[in-house]
Structures are given as structure tokens and as C-alpha cells.
């Protein structure tokens, strides 16, 4: 039986916080559906006056959902060997996705770039996952004082 470190609790809390962020974005889409009168199952508005804003709110949520599975995978796996680093990167990803969404909500898609932090954090999470795989396979030693190359 594998035993996770006590610090893995931070990873679990980060995953829970990410769910709250995704839920927040979903609620924003629901509110926008009412405001802009876009009924289910219609995905996008064709209203020439306000449809663009609704579509930006919808896309911000969908774009986040598109990267959510890899985020959760990298969070869970990278956190096995690097729970603190992964939790910090996970929180940066969450903040970045909120900045991305609210930039997109302006109706000017280029303002999504405010959330570039989320992309950088996701690359970092991928790196910790690859590093964790190397450590698990014994290709690098674990720990800072191992006397050889490691992923730390």
C-alpha cells in the first residue's frame, strides 16, 4: 500500500479550490444566459447587439473546462512527490483562470492574456509530473541532499 505524505492534503485542498473556481464560472454563464436571454440548449447567442458578450462569457468557461482534466491529472500525480510546489502552482493556475475569464468577459478576447499565469502554471505542473515519474522510476534520486541530480 502506498502512503501519501501529510503535505498531500494541500494538493487535495487545491483540487477542491479549483472546483469552486469552475463552479463560479458556471454560475456566471447561468446568470449571463438569463441576462442575454440565451435558452438551453443553445450554446451561443446570435444577437447582434449583446450576443458577443454572452459568447465571451460562455467561451471563458468552456476554455477552462478544456484544460481542467490535464490540470487535475498534473495536480494529483505531480503532488505525490512535490506537494508544496504543486499546490502553489495549482493556486497560480486558479488565479490565472479567473483573470483569464474576467478579461474575456470584457468582450475583448485579447484581454484573456491577463490570465497567462495559468498557462505558465500548467507548464510547471506538467514539469512536476514528469519529474515525479522520473523519481518513481528511480532515474533521479529524491530529496535535496541526495548528492546527485534531482528534480528539486
UniProtKB/Swiss-Prot annotation:
Signal peptide: none annotated. InterPro entries: MAPEG, MAPEG-like_dom_sf, Membr-assoc_MAPEG. GO terms for molecular function: glutathione peroxidase activity; glutathione transferase activity; identical protein binding; leukotriene-C4 synthase activity. GO terms for biological process: arachidonate metabolic process; leukotriene biosynthetic process; prostanoid metabolic process. Its EC number is 2.5.1.-, 1.11.1.-, 4.4.1.20. The chain crosses the membrane at residues 9-29, 71-91, 120-140. Residues 1-8, 92-119 are mitochondrial intermembrane. The keyword Transmembrane helix applies. It is found in: Mitochondrion outer membrane. A lipid is attached at residue 151 (S-palmitoyl cysteine). Residues 30-70, 141-152 are cytoplasmic. GO terms for cellular component: endoplasmic reticulum; mitochondrial outer membrane; nuclear envelope. Keywords: Lipid metabolism, Lipoprotein, Lyase, Membrane, Mitochondrion, Mitochondrion outer membrane, Oxidoreductase, Palmitate, Transferase, Transmembrane, Transmembrane helix. Gene3D superfamilies: Membrane associated eicosanoid/glutathione metabolism-like domain (1.20.120.550). Belongs to the MAPEG family. Displays both glutathione S-transferase and glutathione peroxidase activities toward oxyeicosanoids. Catalyzes the Michael addition reaction of reduced glutathione (GSH) to electrophilic eicosanoids to form GSH adducts, as part of detoxification or metabolic shunt processes. Mediates GSH conjugation to leukotriene A4 to form the sulfidopeptide leukotriene C4. Metabolizes cyclopentenone prostanoids, specifically mediates GSH addition at C9 within the cyclopentenone ring of 15-deoxy-Delta12,14-prostaglandin J2 (15dPGJ2) to form 15dPGJ2-glutathione. L-cysteine cannot substitute for GSH. This is Glutathione S-transferase 3, mitochondrial. It comes from Bos taurus (Bovine).
Amino acid at each position: 500500500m502506498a502512503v501519501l505524505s501529510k503535505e498531500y492534503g494541500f494538493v487535495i485542498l487545491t483540487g477542491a479550490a479549483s472546483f469552486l473556481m469552475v463552479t463560479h464560472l458556471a454560475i456566471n454563464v447561468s446568470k449571463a444566459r438569463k441576462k442575454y436571454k440565451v435558452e438551453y440548449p443553445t450554446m451561443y447567442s446570435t444577437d447582434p447587439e449583446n450576443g458577443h458578450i454572452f459568447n465571451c462569457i460562455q467561451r471563458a468557461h468552456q476554455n477552462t473546462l478544456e484544460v481542467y482534466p490535464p490540470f487535475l491529472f498534473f495536480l494529483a500525480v505531480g503532488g505525490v512527490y512535490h506537494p508544496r510546489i504543486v499546490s502553489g502552482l495549482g493556486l497560480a493556475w486558479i488565479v490565472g483562470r479567473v483573470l483569464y475569464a474576467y478579461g474575456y468577459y470584457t468582450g475583448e478576447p485579447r484581454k484573456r492574456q491577463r490570465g497567462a499565469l495559468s498557462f505558465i502554471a500548467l507548464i510547471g505542473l506538467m514539469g512536476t509530473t514528469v519529474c515525479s515519474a522520473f523519481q518513481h522510476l528511480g532515474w533521479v534520486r529524491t530529496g535535496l541532499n541526495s548528492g546527485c541530480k534531482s528534480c528539486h
